[in-house]
């Protein structure tokens, strides 16, 4: 049973997903399913990025390769998927975090415009 809904904002996540090998896509779908169905999502699947005002990273690992998908909670029951990337350094690149924050701000701008009409 779903405890929350996961949706993608625009096509950033879909483009990222389609570029990945099938095994990585399968792992991403398993993590999305965990986010949708588990009341408490393990931190090895979903981790809050400190200092980002609400941005999370979903963590995918296959062998020695690591990927991240940024997302955030619009409310307790709605998770918005943003962009993804293959992680090649120990720390998450600042440019990727900034892109995620930009997309999150864009989401809220669009949502607020819809609510005004």
Spans of features found by a protein language model:
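Conserved catalytic cores of phosphodiester-cleaving nucleases, focusing on short active-site segments
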Residues: 81-82
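Basic, Lys/Arg-enriched alpha-helical interface segments
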Residues: 1-66, 75-78, 88-117
């Amino acid at each position: 049973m779903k405890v929350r809904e996961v949706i993608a904002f625009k096509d950033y996540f879909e483009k990222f997903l389609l570029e990945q090998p099938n095994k990585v896509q399968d792992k991403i779908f398993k993590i999305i399913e965990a986010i949708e169905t588990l009341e408490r999502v393990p931190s090895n699947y979903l981790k809050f990025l400190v200092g980002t005002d609400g941005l999370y990273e979903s963590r995918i690992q296959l062998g020695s390769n690591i990927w991240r998908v940024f997302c955030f909670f619009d409310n307790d029951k709605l998770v918005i998927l943003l962009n993804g990337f293959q992680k090649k350094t120990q720390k998450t690149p600042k440019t990727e975090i900034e892109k995620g924050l930009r997309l999150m701000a864009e989401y809220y701008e669009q949502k607020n415009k819809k609510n005004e009409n």
